[in-house]
Amino acid sequence: MATATTQRPLKGPAKRMSTWTMTREAITIGFDAGDGFLGRLRGSDITRFRCAGRRFVSISHPDYVDHVLHEARLKYVKSDEYGPIRATAGLNLLTDEGDSWARHRGALNSTFARRHLRGLVGLMIDPIADVTAARVPGAQFDMHQSMVETTLRVVANALFSQDFGPLVQSMHDLATRGLRRAEKLERLGLWGLMPRTVYDTLIWCIYSGVHLPPPLREMQEITLTLDRAINSVIDRRLAEPTNSADLLNVLLSADGGIWPRQRVRDEALTFMLAGHETTANAMSWFWYLMALNPQARDHMLTELDDVLGMRRPTADDLGKLAWTTACLQESQRYFSSVWIIAREAVDDDIIDGHRIRRGTTVVIPIHHIHHDPRWWPDPDRFDPGRFLRCPTDRPRCAYLPFGGGRRICIGQSFALMEMVLMAAIMSQHFTFDLAPGYHVELEATLTLRPKHGVHVIGRRR
């Protein structure tokens, strides 16, 4: 297996952090990228620390990340951070490993290719247009809440060819509560504060329906409620088959229709939850940053007027909206929904002269990489032009909004298409400014979201 080349000069000695400090902050503060646990990982390309008896290495140089995600990918698997997700969504492309993951990923790769997704544009546009048409000009509202509703409707339409209607809000509330409970479970499991066997048993109990004490009962209720909702949709489709091009039909027919019912359920639930959560956050940050940068917004509005006017966009229009796409890419750099990923070393390795022992958890703080001035000059400035200039000397792992390597998010093309359509359709009718007195606060759970929403006023164009 490959190791990182040793002829390159070391990026610097490994930084070492206090075990007590890191353990305390993992428990009490959490994973906050500013003042909390991960904020301490700034300023070094590689940081070593222990937390509750487990070994960790944080890598912030794109060459190191490239090594883990590409060159030596067979030496690393997804870490325990995905255990709580497995409790709710089961075994799926996000939580699976090895040959099983490769087989299922291979069966779905072509489905998420751009040429296939073009057929879903109509299913995406209708719910976006409906939510936009219902907007009251001049009224103050929470854009994050609106994006949650919109993305859930888009994913439900593209996945199931139906609108969940009044269920949208309750499903989002369940997903939000679930993420927060999962983050608390992750602190206990990822940081080794309970034996892994106990941790795995708790996950099994949550999923199986065994009676649990109050701290875990809510997580269990969330899991079982979502399970019933998804299974009812699958039951209806099996009882009344359709010729729809939606993703549920793709899952039911994958590999000739031999996937177990439970696997179809797990994948469908994952696409719905992960697909709406990350995209809703990304769009919330997009509107927030556009409100703070009116020149970039005006440039986008001019592009939309020139390309679309007031007609609905089509799949052919997406490639013509270069500035709109660049604004979305820059907002994902500035506030990446997936702001950290982790891998566990299953074999000894060497990263640029630094030894990585088997069993070490390797943390990749995407948020820090996206704000490193070596790859992003003046990183705190919102500059969509970065993605039109495309410098050739920028390392490929300096930009990771969808992760990287062979496990890069399978839904990235779906998400980008959805985001461009939302930006275009909503901006044809409205401009959005921040509400007076609003101040953003970041909340870093398993995703990076605005803690108290993004409060804006929509003005008719």
UniProtKB/Swiss-Prot annotation:
<keyword id="KW-0408">Iron</keyword>
<dbReference type="InterPro" id="IPR017972">
    <property type="entry name" value="Cyt_P450_CS"/>
</dbReference>
<dbReference type="InterPro" id="IPR001128">
    <property type="entry name" value="Cyt_P450"/>
</dbReference>
<dbReference type="GO" id="GO:0020037">
    <property type="term" value="F:heme binding"/>
</dbReference>
<dbReference type="InterPro" id="IPR036396">
    <property type="entry name" value="Cyt_P450_sf"/>
</dbReference>
<keyword id="KW-0479">Metal-binding</keyword>
<keyword id="KW-0560">Oxidoreductase</keyword>
<feature type="binding site" description="axial binding residue">
    <location>
        <position position="409"/>
    </location>
    <ligand>
        <name>heme</name>
    </ligand>
</feature>
<dbReference type="InterPro" id="IPR002401">
    <property type="entry name" value="Cyt_P450_E_grp-I"/>
</dbReference>
<keyword id="KW-0503">Monooxygenase</keyword>
<dbReference type="GO" id="GO:0005506">
    <property type="term" value="F:iron ion binding"/>
</dbReference>
<dbReference type="InterPro" id="IPR050196">
    <property type="entry name" value="Cytochrome_P450_Monoox"/>
</dbReference>
<keyword id="KW-0349">Heme</keyword>
<comment type="similarity">
    <text>Belongs to the cytochrome P450 family.</text>
</comment>
<protein>
    <recommendedName>
        <fullName>Putative cytochrome P450 132</fullName>
        <ecNumber>1.14.-.-</ecNumber>
    </recommendedName>
</protein>
<dbReference type="GO" id="GO:0016705">
    <property type="term" value="F:oxidoreductase activity, acting on paired donors, with incorporation or reduction of molecular oxygen"/>
</dbReference>
<dbReference type="Pfam" id="PF00067">
    <property type="entry name" value="p450"/>
</dbReference>
<dbReference type="GO" id="GO:0004497">
    <property type="term" value="F:monooxygenase activity"/>
</dbReference>
